[in-house]
Amino acid sequence: MAVCIIDHGNIRGVIYFEPVHGKDKVLGSVIGLKSGTYSLIIHRYGDISRGCESIGSPEIFIGNIFVNRYGVAYVYLDTDVNISTIIGKALSISKNDQRLACGVIGISFINEKIIHFLTINENGV
């Protein structure tokens, strides 16, 4: 299992890469974006020393996520990515080829308990 923590200004989230019933899934949630469609992309380097400028070229398109009117995206995507090959690389959230937020993909402890996703209600709480 792998995890990427996104913490870039108002944009925050947790994205997990994990096998579920024999298929690899991308699960998580992101808050702080405007309503619309965004892309999840794996990049060559896990170097975020200069923000998303230093993560290198895009390598793998994971899929699109939709942010609702409350600024929340719930992520549940299938992927063919071999999880062991993406450890140490970066994941970006992009729109129109602009990298809005990114984080490094790391190894995560496998926990059989329920994953609590970030949630927000209509009052912004």
From Swiss-Prot:
Single GO biological process annotation from the record: superoxide metabolic process
Keyword vocabulary terms for this entry: Disulfide bond, Host cytoplasm, Virion
GO molecular function list: metal ion binding
Function summary: Superoxide dismutase-like protein with no enzymatic activity.
Disulfide-bond pairs as recorded: C52-C102
Main localization category: virion
Subcellular localization: Virion; Host cytoplasm
InterPro entries, A to Z: SOD-like_Cu/Zn_dom_sf
Name this protein carries in UniProt: Cu-Zn superoxide dismutase-like protein OPG175
Keyword Disulfide bond listed: yes
Keyword Cell cycle: no
Protein family: Belongs to the Cu-Zn superoxide dismutase family.
GO cellular component annotations of the record: host cell cytoplasm; virion component
Highest taxon, organism lineage: Viruses
